[in-house]
Design a protein with these regions (language model features):
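Gram-negative bacterial Sec-dependent N-terminal signal peptides
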Residues: 1-19
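Short secondary-structure boundary motifs at beta->alpha junctions and helix caps
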Residues: 33-34, 38-43, 117-152
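Extracytoplasmic/secreted envelope proteins and their assembly/folding machinery
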Residues: 50, 54, 58, 143-150
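Functional cleft and adjacent loop/helix regions within the main domain
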Residues: 142, 153-162
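Sec-exported extracytoplasmic/periplasmic mature domains
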Residues: 54, 58-62, 66, 154-158
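Short structured motifs
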Residues: 43, 58, 92-94
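A structural "domain/chain start" motif
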Residues: 13-53, 69, 76, 82-85, ...
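Surface-exposed short loop/turn segments
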Residues: 66-118, 128-134
Length: 162
């Protein structure tokens, strides 16, 4: 009898969790970044970066039930690599992958709660200390920006006008 009660409670708990729809996250690439991608950075790399932003935000907001049923519409407005991209390396044969600099990204958009409340998003972070740039790959600082942004969003911290 006790086993039946435990099984019933577990089933009800899983059914409630299944009813809660996770947040819908969409990421588009801003017009200026699209032009920059076509000219210097590489379209495929910037598209991959947008996918990484979407996945990072999805993972973080899934940890906060306040975002269940919400829509998060983001625009990757700018991205700066730490190291040369494949396109930059192919366009300038004398350029070395060992070259490095500071990078980062800017994210804009809106978070639309299930209730309809709209919160504007404007977040950017660019590393200011070149000593940290040597440690990572091509998009290390941009990926750090995504992680910081997604963590702030998950915790409900203010993400507008940073």
């Amino acid at each position: 009898m006790r086993m039946l009660a435990v099984a019933t409670i577990a089933l009800l708990g899983s059914a409630t969790a299944a009813l809660a729809a996770p947040a819908s996250v969409s990421v588009s690439i801003g017009a200026e970044l699209q032009a920059k991608a076509a000219k210097t950075l590489g379209v495929r790399e910037v598209n991959d970066l947008a996918t990484e932003l979407r996945k990072t935000v999805e993972r973080q907001v899934a940890k906060n039930p306040a975002y269940d049923g919400a829509r998060i519409e983001l625009v990757l407005a700018d991205a700066q690599p730490n190291r040369p991209t494949f396109k930059q390396l192919s366009d300038a044969p004398g350029l070395s992958y060992e070259s490095f600099g500071v990078g980062g990204a800017q994210i804009r958009g809106v978070a639309i709660a299930a209730s309809g409340a709209v919160t504007p998003i404007d977040y950017k972070y660019y590393e200011s200390d070149i000593r940290w740039a040597r440690r990572g790959g091509t998009w290390a600082d941009a990926e750090d920006t995504f992680q910081r942004f997604a963590s702030d969003l998950r915790r409900g911290e203010r993400v507008a006008a940073r």
